[in-house]
């Protein structure tokens, strides 16, 4: 899995300069679930390129999900396009496909619209369609706002989910980002809570449960071109059949051109 990711990163780095390549990232993500819920390993390579008013992202991921008695492997490819139409309108369009396993969502499409209608304020709305393992489909509509106050960015997002077999649910997410006084480093905290336990790791019993999570990330510049990202988080699931939690640890290296 790691070898495939490093190979993809090597291929990406060989792209010609005229493609507008701005960064290459290689990362690893590990989640350990309590009880007999196993663990999840994910390695990925990602590139970002700039073409006039558009920013393009390409990601190739390899994942493994280990349960107590079952094991699944999967590959996922995804892409996204951010387009700046003018000074107040930006859109994000994303699509992803993966193997039909519990590791990733099989299909994922999202469309976000960002509106800078007020000074130091960004409004966001969007739609997301996801098809999980075993043909479970989820439609999600979200809306939020971000406030820019000096080095601090505070964001709130509400999401409503409509599942093909579990009905409606929701989630609330708050994030606070503190930019370093100098350089490009920053620290970001996420807090979320809701009744829609929909994640890429699709576990059937979470369809009818609730969840809450906390995650802390540090982006630390090592040189002018190389950044190190470290993330630690925890999620708690409360389901009709079992209560359990997951501990997440992640690391990534990003080279900027």
From Swiss-Prot:
Residues 1-19 form the signal peptide. It holds the Pfam family YaiO. It is found in: Cell outer membrane. The keyword Calcium does not apply. The keyword Glycosyltransferase does not apply. GO terms for cellular component: cell outer membrane. InterPro entries: YaiO, YaiO_beta-barrel_dom. Keywords: Cell outer membrane, Membrane, Signal. This is Outer membrane protein YaiO. It comes from Escherichia coli (strain K12). The gene is yaiO.
């Amino acid at each position: 899995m790691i070898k495939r990711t490093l190979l993809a990163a090597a291929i990406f780095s060989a792209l010609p300069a005229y493609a507008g390549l701005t960064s290459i990232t290689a990362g690893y993500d590990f989640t350990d679930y309590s009880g007999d819920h196993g663990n999840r390993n994910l390695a990925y390579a990602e590139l970002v390129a700039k073409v006039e008013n558009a920013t393009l992202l390409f990601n190739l991921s390899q994942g493994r999900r280990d349960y107590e008695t079952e094991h699944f492997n999967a590959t996922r490819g995804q892409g996204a396009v951010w387009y700046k139409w003018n000074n107040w309108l930006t859109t994000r369009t994303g699509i992803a496909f993966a193997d039909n396993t519990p590791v990733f969502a099989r299909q994922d499409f999202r469309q976000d619209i960002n509106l800078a209608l007020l000074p130091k304020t960004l409004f966001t709305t969007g739609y997301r369609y996801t098809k999980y393992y075993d043909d479970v489909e989820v439609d999600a509509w979200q809306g939020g706002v971000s406030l820019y106050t000096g080095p601090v960015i505070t964001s709130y997002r509400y999401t409503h989910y409509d599942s093909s077999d579990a009905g409606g649910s929701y989630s609330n997410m708050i994030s606070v980002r503190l930019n370093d006084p100098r350089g490009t480093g920053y620290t970001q905290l996420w807090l979320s809570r809701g009744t829609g336990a929909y994640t890429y790791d699709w576990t059937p019993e979470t369809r009818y449960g609730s969840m809450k999570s906390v995650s802390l990330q540090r982006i630390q510049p090592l040189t002018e071109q190389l950044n190190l990202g470290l993330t630690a988080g925890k999620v708690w699931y409360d389901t009709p059949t079992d209560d359990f939690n997951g501990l997440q640890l992640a690391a990534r290296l990003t080279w900027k051109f």
